UniProtKB/Swiss-Prot annotation:
Name listed for the protein in its UniProt record: Ribosome-binding factor A
SUPFAM superfamilies: Ribosome-binding factor A, RbfA
Gene from which the chain derives: rbfA
Organism: Pseudomonas putida (strain W619)
Pfam families registered for this protein in UniProt: RBFA (PF02033)
GO cellular component annotations of the record: cytosol
Length: 132
C-alpha cells in the first residue's frame, strides 16, 4: 500500500498543528494578532519551512507586516519548541509569509456577487421592457 503523503507533507501538517498551538500559548508579543496558520511548505531537505498565515480582524497591510515581523523574530524560539515537541533530528528554519489566497478569495466572491446582482438587474429591466 503506497503512502498517501510524502514525508515533507506529513512533517508540514504536524508543524502546522504544533505552531498554531505554540503561537497561541507561548508567543506573548502584542504585535501578533489573531493569527491562523493556513499552510506549511517544508523543503525536501527539511532545511526550510515556509509558514503561511492570515491575520483575522486586523487585515490592514500595517497590521499584517507587524504580525509577520513579530513572528519572524520569534522564529528561533518557535523552532526550539518545535524541536522538543516533534522530536526531529533537525528542525527546519521558519520563514513566515502572508497568505493572500484568503483575501483573493474574498475579493473574487465579492466580484461574483456583484456580477450576479447586475445580471439580475438587467434581466428584470429586460422583462419590464418586453411587457410594455
Amino acid at each position: 500500500m503506497a503512502k498517501e503523503y510524502s514525508r515533507t507533507q506529513r512533517i508540514g501538517d504536524q508543524m502546522q498543528r504544533e505552531l498554531a498551538e505554540l503561537i497561541r500559548r507561548e508567543v506573548k508579543d502584542p504585535r501578533v494578532g489573531l493569527v491562523t496558520i493556513t499552510a506549511v511548505d517544508v523543503s525536501r531537505d527539511l532545511g526550510h519551512a515556509k509558514v503561511f498565515i492570515t491575520v483575522m480582524g486586523e487585515e490592514t497591510p500595517d497590521a499584517v507586516q507587524q504580525s509577520l515581523k513579530a513572528l519572524n523574530s520569534a522564529a528561533s524560539f518557535l523552532r526550539l519548541h518545535l524541536g522538543r515537541s516533534m522530536q526531529l533530528r533537525s528542525v527546519p528554519q521558519l520563514h513566515f509569509h502572508f497568505d493572500e489566497s484568503v483575501s483573493r478569495g474574498v475579493h473574487l466572491s465579492a466580484l461574483i456577487e456583484r456580477a450576479v446582482a447586475e445580471d439580475r438587474l438587467h434581466k428584470d429591466t429586460d422583462e419590464q421592457d418586453t411587457k410594455e
